[in-house]
């Protein structure tokens, strides 16, 4: 990962151990933050031609859901989902110089409950387990667990503007030592506006802030960002997405502050009623006030996603 050389040279051994642990932590947090910029997974068995769809917020990615739907039929609030994906990266360690390429595997399973309290208020509850494994740099391997809950409010008179609030408990486990290396409680608040262009494509944009509530560590940070996206249904089985986000990562310790940008293009193809194949290509640039903490990376990926609603 990045060389955190802006820290005091006189760090104790425990501080150096924390720095080493921060390497997979930053990768994990970046993946968590930008998950909405990867392929946008469907949570319904109908296409835009069959249902009225509202794009969700990046906070929904923390809860495993990517779309909120106004069902014309009886809703099915429970979802079981699983993902298997492979990615390549030209900068596995998020380094400023001396970058190293690698490939990594991501597997995720989640259980989601999404009750619709009324036409304006939708809830969501999630339990998710994720596994990250690298081909060359096994010291970057980690497991991540998320428990979350949230609400999305859709005012009837504000022209497709949605307000959302999320709580997440996030836990990262070191694969080599089989112990916990990072935990965090966070609250995310945001607003999003959707612009329907037709029944098969639309634009959306929004803003969100994530506030960390856990104990301060070298990796604890607050995140504030604006984002925009475009979604199109090319056919009843093929979808495509463009996404861009610029965010401020404000770290609790060391005076570190990063401007992080992510751009993604993605496509998804429906193989069966419940199985989807997807591909994505992401570009990330990080500009930090810390010494040797700037980096950029490219990451193409392909995967399969299974979604069962009941």
Walk through the language-model features, giving the residues of each:
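N-terminal periplasmic/intermembrane-space "pro-region" immediately following the signal or transit peptide
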Residues: 19-79
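Outer-membrane beta-barrel channels and translocator barrels
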Residues: 73, 114-120, 154-158, 196-200, ...
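Transmembrane beta-strands of outer-membrane beta-barrel proteins
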Residues: 78-82, 107, 123-125, 161-165, ...
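Outer-membrane beta-barrel "beta-signal"
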Residues: 269-270, 274-276, 280, 296-310
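Residues that define the transmembrane beta-barrel architecture of outer-membrane proteins
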Residues: 101-107, 141-147, 181-187, 218-224, ...
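Outer-membrane pore/translocation modules
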Residues: 127-221
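Surface-exposed strand-loop-strand hairpins of Gram-negative outer-membrane beta-barrel proteins
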Residues: 75, 85-112, 135-137
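Transmembrane beta-strands of outer-membrane beta-barrel pores
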Residues: 84-92, 115, 129-133, 167-173, ...
């Amino acid at each position: 990962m990045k060389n955190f050389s802006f820290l005091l040279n006189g760090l104790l051994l425990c501080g150096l151990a924390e720095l080493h642990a921060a390497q997979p932590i930053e990768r994990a947090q970046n993946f968590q933050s930008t998950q909405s910029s990867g392929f946008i997974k469907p949570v319904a068995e109908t296409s835009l031609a069959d249902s009225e769809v509202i794009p969700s917020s990046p906070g929904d990615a923390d809860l495993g859901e990517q779309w909120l739907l106004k069902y014309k039929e009886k809703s099915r609030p429970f979802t079981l989902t699983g993902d298997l994906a492979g990615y390549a990266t030209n900068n596995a360690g998020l380094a400023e110089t001396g970058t190293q390429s690698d490939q990594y595997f991501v597997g995720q399973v989640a259980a989601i409950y999404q009750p619709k309290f009324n036409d304006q208020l939708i809830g969501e509850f999630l339990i998710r387990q994720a596994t990250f494994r690298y081909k060359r740099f096994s010291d970057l391997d980690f497991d991540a667990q998320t428990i979350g809950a949230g609400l999305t409010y859709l005012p009837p008179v504000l022209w497709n503007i949605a307000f959302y609030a999320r709580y997440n408990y996030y836990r990262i486990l070191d694969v080599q030592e089989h112990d916990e290396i990072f935990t965090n409680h966070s609250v995310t608040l945001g607003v999003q506006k959707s612009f329907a262009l037709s029944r098969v494509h639309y634009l959306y944009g929004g803003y969100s802030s994530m506030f960390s509530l856990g104990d301060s560590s070298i990796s604890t940070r607050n995140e504030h960002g604006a984002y925009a996206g475009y979604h199109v249904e090319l056919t009843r089985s093929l979808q495509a997405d463009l996404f861009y986000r610029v965010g401020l990562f404000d770290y609790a310790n060391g005076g570190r502050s990063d401007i992080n940008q992510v751009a993604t293009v993605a496509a998804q193809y429906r193989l069966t009623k419940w199985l989807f194949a997807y591909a994505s290509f992401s570009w990330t640039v990080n500009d930090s006030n810390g010494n040797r903490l700037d980096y950029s990376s490219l990451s193409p990926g392909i995967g399969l996603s299974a979604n069962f609603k009941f």
